[in-house]
Amino acid sequence: MEDAAAPGRTEGVLERQGAPPAAGQGGALVELTPTPGGLALVSPYHTHRAGDPLDLVALAEQVQKADEFIRANATNKLTVIAEQIQHLQEQARKVLEDAHRDANLHHVACNIVKKPGNIYYLYKRESGQQYFSIISPKEWGTSCPHDFLGAYKLQHDLSWTPYEDIEKQDAKISMMDTLLSQSVALPPCTEPNFQGLTH
């Protein structure tokens, strides 16, 4: 009799303790608890809050700051491009001016065949005609018959260099000739060379 009454007493104790009833033959479902074993796995504040207005403000500030940085970077790059364009425009203007000058000098009257590498002296008659001569004002001395306008050197590309720029232009041409005449020597070994890096 006592054994038969034991299960009843046990069921009563379980019911008073709030144990869930069995779900069929498969057993009971596990109860949900926010702190299993006394430890919180997630933050209830972050999982249950509807939204923090401060986060939206911070996000908007971040987007605005990014826009400002992007605008500043684009402005800096455009400034560099504008400076390059201005420099190219100045170079283009100088090229056109030099081409116009060279064309005019090639149409100046001259009784000799002009040869590249020589310096020619430009004079102007009383009639207004301009002409080239191989005689310099120094060679004429005080008996120079006409007004001296300038001296030019005929380059091998048939361009003209003013007398005051001849030395600088010759230095540039000499440097370019030196670079073009140098042969590019390949290293004897294409494998990595660690000489001097190891003890």
Swiss-Prot record:
Instruction: Give the residues annotated as coiled coil.
Output: 71-101
Q: What is the name attached to this protein's record?
A: Uncharacterized protein C1orf50
Q: Which Pfam families does the UniProt record give?
A: DUF2452
Keywords in UniProt for this one?
A: Coiled coil
An example molecular function term from Gene Ontology annotations? identical protein binding
Is Coiled coil among this UniProt entry's keywords? yes
Q: Which InterPro entries match?
A: DUF2452
Entry-linked PANTHER family: SIMILAR TO CHROMOSOME 1 OPEN READING FRAME 50, UNCHARACTERIZED PROTEIN C1ORF50
Tree of life domain: Eukaryota
The yes or no answer to whether the keyword Coiled coil is present is yes
**Residue numbers spanned by region Disordered:** 1-30
